[in-house]
Curated annotation (Swiss-Prot):
This is NADH-ubiquinone oxidoreductase chain 4L. Gene3D superfamilies: 1.10.287.3510. Core subunit of respiratory chain NADH dehydrogenase (Complex I) which is composed of 45 different subunits. Its EC number is 7.1.1.2. It is a multi-pass membrane protein. The keyword Mitochondrion applies. It is an enzyme of class 7 (translocase). The keyword Repeat does not apply. It comes from Balaenoptera musculus (Blue whale).
């Protein structure tokens, strides 16, 4: 395993740890999820470049498109929650509190 692959896997694991530690705010959870998607994109692109598998060249681009789509939905959810509740705490999204 090369040093670049180790760095990308470390970035993914740091984003995962950040998601587990800072899950009280919706904005920090979205940022950690975006970091995970970016590291997956880089890992997929590096793997395809190293293996010379030309049939899978579209996979990182499709992953990036889905990441942008999920980020747009997450930001729309963040705006809706902050306008409705006045805060971005994940605890305010609990439907059982009513």
């Amino acid at each position: 395993m090369t040093l670049i692959h180790m760095n990308v896997l470390m970035a993914f694991s740091m984003s995962l740890v950040g998601l587990l530690m800072y899950r009280s705010h919706l904005m920090s959870a979205l940022l950690c999820l975006e970091g995970m998607m970016l590291s997956l994109f880089v890992l997929a692109a590096l793997t395809i470049l190293n293996s010379h598998f030309t049939l899978a060249n579209m996979m990182p681009i499709i992953l990036l498109v889905f990441a942008a789509y999920v980020a747009a939905i997450g930001l729309a959810l963040l705006v809706m929650v902050s306008n409705t509740y006045g805060t971005d705490y994940v605890q305010s999204l609990n439907l059982l509190q009513c």
